[in-house]
């Protein structure tokens, strides 16, 4: 893929990633919620002069349509130009062993890794790939958890966070120009919570319709306004739905109930308040862990459990919490 033309606010992460890729052997995982800019960061690093100089052979392999170990092997083999009888796991390992220094990027690796019934085989295959010392492995994954059986390069990159306000503003004006009212731009960026995908989508609309019209549309359409595209790179709702429909979320259905409650709390909730409010949600600790592992929620600097604004808006619109779940929480806060 081509190098991103708009890239603001990830300079520290980029330097950290490139430094990790220059170590031997490099095994790096980029984590974070959907739309946070994982792929953009990786592609920018892929075009870094230092990375290009070190790795004469570089493969970028999308895994978002890969569901099983067999399809993962077939997809990697195809990108390595191994066909027919030479498209097996054994042939992939042999081929990479004979290559010079190689960078192997597996993008959206959560798709094959998430299903619990196939995870062991997926991780065993990753371990085989990392046995080849001159092959650097770089994966991107939704969530906050790295696959096991791989000795990931230290120091780890933290899961990506939203952009800083300045970086989000720079991104916006680079797409929509500087002709807009500063107050209206600020209101639009507040909607996005500085998630890169949301900033990009709202800036594209503002560029053609203006900030005021975009704000008026948001009041009516909410996240549907940012969902005109047909894939998760251009459609915020598709990106959120992918996280909501992950196997991990499906394994603990009450996690959606907790997400619904959190969608009502723009400032999040402390661990103490969450437990003392006694919401009618079974396995609440497991639900919290699930939301954190899928990056549908996060812990802020004050230790509060929170959900990013675009996800809150989507959940309130499409799967709002039922009154019997909200009632204990409302009573608890009213009694404080």
Predicted regions and their residues:
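Structural motif corresponding to alpha-helix initiation and N-cap regions
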Residues: 85-90, 119-123, 182, 281-285
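Hydrophobic residues at beta-strand termini and immediately following loops
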Residues: 61, 158-160, 333
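Phosphate/oxyanion-binding loops and surfaces in catalytic or ligand/nucleic-acid-binding neighborhoods
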Residues: 24, 36, 49, 79-83, ...
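Short amphipathic alpha-helical segments and helix-helix/interface helices
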Residues: 14, 93-94, 107, 122-130, ...
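Loop-to-helix "switch" segment enriched in basic
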Residues: 198-252, 330
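C-terminal boundary/linker of central alpha/beta nucleotide-binding cores
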Residues: 42-43, 185, 192, 203-207, ...
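Alpha-helical sensor/transducer elements of the RecA-like P-loop NTPase core
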Residues: 10-12, 40-44, 70-75, 103, ...
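Post-nucleotide-binding-loop coupling segment downstream of the phosphate-binding loop, primarily
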Residues: 3-8, 12-22, 26-105, 109-115, ...
């Amino acid at each position: 893929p081509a190098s991103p033309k708009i890239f603001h606010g990830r300079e520290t992460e980029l330097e950290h990633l490139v430094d990790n890729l220059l170590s031997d052997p490099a095994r790096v995982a980029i984590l974070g919620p959907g739309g946070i800019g994982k792929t953009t960061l990786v592609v920018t690093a892929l075009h870094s002069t230092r990375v290009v100089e070190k790795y004469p052979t570089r493969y970028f392999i999308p895994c978002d349509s890969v569901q099983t170990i067999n399809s993962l092997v077939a997809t990697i083999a195809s990108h390595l130009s191994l066909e027919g009888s030479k498209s097996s796991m054994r042939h992939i390992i042999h081929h990479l062993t004979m290559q010079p220094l190689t960078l192997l990027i597996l993008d959206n690796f959560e798709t094959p890794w998430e299903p619990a019934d196939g995870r062991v085989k997926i991780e065993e295959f990753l371990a085989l790939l990392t046995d080849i010392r001159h092959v650097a492995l770089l994966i991107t994954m939704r969530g906050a958890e790295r696959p096991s059986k791989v000795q990931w390069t230290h120091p780890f990159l933290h899961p990506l966070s939203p952009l800083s306000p300045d970086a989000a503003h720079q991104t916006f004006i680079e797409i929509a120009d500087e002709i807009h009212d500063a107050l209206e731009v600020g209101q639009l960026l507040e909607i996005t919570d500085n998630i890169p995908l949301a900033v990009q989508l709202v800036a594209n609309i503002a560029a053609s319709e203006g900030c005021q019209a975009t704000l008026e549309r948001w009041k009516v359409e909410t996240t549907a306004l940012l969902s005109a595209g047909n894939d998760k790179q251009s459609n915020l709702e598709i990106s959120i739905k992918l996280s909501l429909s992950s196997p991990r979320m499906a394994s603990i259905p009450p996690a959606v109930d907790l997400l619904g409650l959190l969608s009502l709390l723009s400032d999040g909730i402390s661990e103490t308040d969450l437990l003392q409010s006694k919401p009618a949600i079974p396995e609440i600790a497991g639900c919290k862990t699930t939301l954190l592992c899928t990056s549908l929620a996060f812990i802020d600097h004050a230790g509060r459990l929170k959900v990013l604004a675009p996800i809150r808006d989507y959940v309130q619109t499409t799967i709002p919490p039922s009154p019997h779940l909200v009632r204990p929480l409302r009573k608890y806060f009213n009694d404080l």
